[in-house]
C-alpha cells in the first residue's frame, strides 16, 4: 500500500499524458467494417482550464473518429498510471461512444483533483476498445494541467508564556466547549479560584512580576501528572516577587478586556485546547523546537537543550565564551551542559531544498527567541571588531530584523511562503516585560494579511512558546509509541492555539492533541516536504483545524487598539526577553 501523502499541495505542474491506447475490454452492440483494418482513431482537446486550484476539475473533449467505414461502439476507460497519492480521478460523460460510418462520436473527459491531491507529474491512460477489442490506430495523446495549492502561505506567530486557563477566560469559547478552568488545586490539595490580573505592566492591576518557567518549575507543577504543584513555582529570579504580588501569584487569569482581539480570533476561527509545548521548560529550547522539531545539539544526540543560557545573556553561535545551556535526557534528567551552538537539519533546510521561500522575523540577533542563531550552518559566525556575528547566506537573506518588517513585506506583496514571526518583548505577552500590546501586534499581522490578496491562500498559526509558570489544569500526554522521537518523554504544558485562514473551521474547538511538531508537520504536508524525523514524527498535522472544501471565510477586520502603522513606525529599542 502506498504511504499516506500530504493533505495540501504547493503550486506544481500536473502533467497528464492522456495516452490514448487500447486496453483489453469489451464494447456493446454490433459493428461493421473491413476485417483487419483500423476501425477508429481518438483525439483529445487540451484540458480547459489549463490551470486549476486543488479541489477543482478540468475537462477535455475526446473525439472517436471512425475509419474504413466502421460502424459500432467504442468503450472508453482511463487509469492513473503514475504520480502522487491520492491521484486525480477521471471520468467520461459518455461511454461507450457510438460511431457510424463517417460520423464521429464525442465524450467529455473530466479530470478532477481533490483538496488533498499532491503536486507532481501524472500520467493518465485513456483506453479505447471497439467490438473486436481493437485499440485506436493513432497512439498516445498528451495533456497537461497546472494546479495551484489551496494553502500557499503559512505564517507562524510565536507569542510568549501563557496557558489557556490564564489567557482565554472567554465565556463564548467556554460555551462552545473549550476546556478552560476557573480554579485549580495546589500542593495542599486546596482549591484556588483564579484571580484577574492585567496583561501588561501598566494599569490598576499590573502584571509586575514573572514566574519561573525553568524545567524545575515544570517538574513541580506537573507532580507526576497530578497538576497540583503550581503554588511551588517561585517568582523568576529577575523579578523576585514584589511585595504587592498576589497571595497565589500562579493562579491568575488575564483580564478579558485586555485580550479581546485574541477572543475575536479564537471565536471566529479555530481554537485548540489541546496544544502543548513540546519541551518541558523555557523559551530557548521552545524556539529550537518550532524551527527544527528538536533542541538537540546534533542529529545523533539523545540529549536536548532544556533551559535558557547560563554564563551570558547572548544566545546561540554568537554567545560569549563561557556561555552554556543545560541538556536533558528523554527520561527528564538534566546531567550536562554545552555551548549553545548546534548543528543539525532544520525545517529551513527542507524548504531550501524544495525551493520554498521562507523568512524568520525577529527583534534582534543573539536572542534566545531568535532560533536560527543557534544553528551553525545558518549562522556561520564570524568575528567583527571582536564580536561574533552571524554571516551565513541564509541568515543574511532570510533572517529579518526587526520583526515589524513582516508588516511592510505583506503590504509590498513580498510575503514568503513560510514565515516565522517573533515579537519584541513589549508586544510578546511575556509577564513583567510586556506593555499589553501583544493582542494588537498579532491582530495587525492578521489584518494586513486579511485585507490583502494573501488572504485567499494563507494559513496563520498563532501559539505561545511556553506556559510561563501560570497554572493550567490539563496534564500533558506522554510520547510513548516506542519508536519515534521522544518516546517516553512528556510534552510540556498547554499553550493556546489559534488557526486563522479562509479554510480554517469556523467557531471550532479542536480537542485533538497538538504540539510544536504539529506545526512543522503541517508545513511539511503543505509543501510536500520529507519529515525532519524529530517531533514532527509523533505529531498530527493540524488537519482537523481545516476544511478545504467549504466556502472560504470572508475576512472581517479584527478590532484592536493599535494598528500596523503603529508597529512599523515604533522606533523604541527592542526589549530583550527574560533570561531565566
Question: Model-derived features: where do they sit?
Answer:
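Long beta-sheet-rich domains in secretory-pathway and surface-associated proteins
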Residues: 26-148
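N-terminal pro-sequences and low-complexity stem/linker regions of secreted or lumenal proteins
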Residues: 148-580
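Bacterial N-terminal signal peptides that target proteins for export
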Residues: 1-13
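Core hydrophobic alpha-helical transmembrane segments of single-pass membrane proteins
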Residues: 14-18
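C-terminal motif of bacterial Sec signal peptides marking the signal peptidase cleavage site
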Residues: 21-25
Amino acid at each position: 500500500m502506498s504511504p499516506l501523502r500530504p493533505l495540501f499541495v504547493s503550486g506544481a505542474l500536473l502533467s497528464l499524458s492522456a495516452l490514448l491506447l487500447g486496453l483489453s475490454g469489451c464494447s456493446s452492440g454490433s459493428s461493421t467494417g473491413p476485417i483487419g483494418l483500423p476501425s477508429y482513431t481518438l483525439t483529445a482537446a487540451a484540458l480547459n482550464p489549463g490551470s486549476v486550484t486543488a479541489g477543482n476539475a478540468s475537462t477535455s473533449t475526446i473525439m472517436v473518429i471512425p475509419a474504413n467505414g466502421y460502424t459500432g461502439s467504442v468503450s472508453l476507460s482511463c487509469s492513473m498510471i503514475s504520480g502522487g497519492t491520492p491521484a486525480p480521478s477521471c471520468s467520461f460523460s459518455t461511454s461507450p461512444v457510438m460511431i457510424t460510418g463517417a460520423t464521429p462520436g464525442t465524450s467529455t473527459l473530466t479530470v478532477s483533483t481533490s483538496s488533498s491531491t499532491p503536486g507532481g507529474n501524472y500520467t493518465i491512460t485513456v483506453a479505447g476498445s471497439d467490438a473486436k477489442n481493437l485499440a485506436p490506430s493513432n497512439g498516445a495523446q498528451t495533456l497537461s494541467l497546472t494546479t495551484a495549492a489551496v494553502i500557499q502561505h503559512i505564517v507562524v506567530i510565536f507569542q510568549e508564556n501563557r496557558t489557556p486557563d490564564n489567557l482565554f477566560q472567554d465565556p463564548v469559547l467556554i460555551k462552545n466547549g473549550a476546556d478552560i478552568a476557573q480554579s485549580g488545586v495546589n500542593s495542599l490539595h486546596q482549591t484556588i479560584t483564579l484571580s484577574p490580573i492585567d496583561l501588561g505592566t501598566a494599569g490598576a492591576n499590573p502584571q509586575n512580576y514573572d514566574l519561573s518557567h525553568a524545567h524545575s518549575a515544570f517538574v513541580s507543577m506537573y507532580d507526576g501528572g497530578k497538576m497540583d504543584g503550581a503554588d511551588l513555582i517561585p517568582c523568576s529570579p529577575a523579578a523576585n516577587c514584589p511585595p504587592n504580588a498576589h497571595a497565589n501569584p500562579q493562579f491568575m487569569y488575564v483580564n478579558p478586556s485586555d485580550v479581546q482581539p485574541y477572543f475575536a480570533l479564537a471565536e471566529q476561527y479555530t481554537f485548540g485546547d489541546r496544544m502543548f509545548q513540546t519541551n518541558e521548560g523555557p523559551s530557548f529550547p521552545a524556539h529550537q523546537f518550532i524551527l527544527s522539531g528538536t533542541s538537540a545539539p546534533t542529529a545523533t544526540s539523545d540529549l536536548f537543550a532544556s533551559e535558557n543560557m547560563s554564563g551570558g545573556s547572548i544566545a546561540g553561535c554568537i554567545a560569549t565564551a563561557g556561555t552554556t545551556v543545560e541538556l536533558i535526557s528523554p527520561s527528564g534528567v538534566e546531567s550536562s551542559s554545552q555551548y549553545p551552538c548546534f548543528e543539525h537539519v532544520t525545517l529551513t533546510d527542507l524548504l531550501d531544498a524544495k525551493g520554498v521561500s521562507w523568512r524568520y522575523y525577529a527583534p534582534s540577533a543573539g536572542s534566545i527567541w531568535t532560533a536560527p542563531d543557534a544553528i551553525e550552518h545558518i549562522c556561520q559566525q564570524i568575528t567583527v571588531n571582536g564580536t561574533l556575528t552571524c554571516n551565513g547566506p541564509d541568515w543574511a537573506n532570510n533572517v529579518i530584523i526587526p520583526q515589524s518588517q513582516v508588516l511592510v513585506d505583506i503590504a509590498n506583496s513580498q510575503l514568503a511562503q513560510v514565515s516565522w514571526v517573533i515579537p519584541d518583548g513589549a508586544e510578546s505577552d511575556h509577564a513583567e516585560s510586556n506593555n499589553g500590546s501583544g493582542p494588537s501586534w498579532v491582530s495587525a499581522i492578521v489584518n494586513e494579511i486579511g485585507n490583502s490578496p494573501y488572504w485567499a491562500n494563507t494559513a496563520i498559526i498563532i501559539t505561545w512558546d511556553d506556559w510561563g509558570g501560570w497554572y493550567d489544569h490539563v496534564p500533558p500526554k506522554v510520547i510513548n509509541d516506542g519508536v519515534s522521537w521522544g518516546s517516553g518523554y512528556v510534552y510540556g504544558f498547554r499553550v493556546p492555539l489559534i488557526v486563522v485562514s479562509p479554510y480554517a473551521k469556523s467557531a471550532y474547538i479542536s480537542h485533538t492533541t497538538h504540539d510544536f511538531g504539529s506545526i512543522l508537520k503541517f508545513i511539511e504536508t503543505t509543501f510536500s516536504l520529507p519529515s525532519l524525523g524529530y517531533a514532527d514524527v509523533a505529531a498530527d498535522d493540524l488537519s482537523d483545524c481545516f476544511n478545504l472544501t467549504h466556502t472560504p471565510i470572508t475576512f472581517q477586520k479584527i478590532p484592536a487598539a493599535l494598528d500596523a502603522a503603529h508597529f512599523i513606525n515604533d522606533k523604541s529599542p527592542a526589549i530583550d526577553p527574560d533570561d531565566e
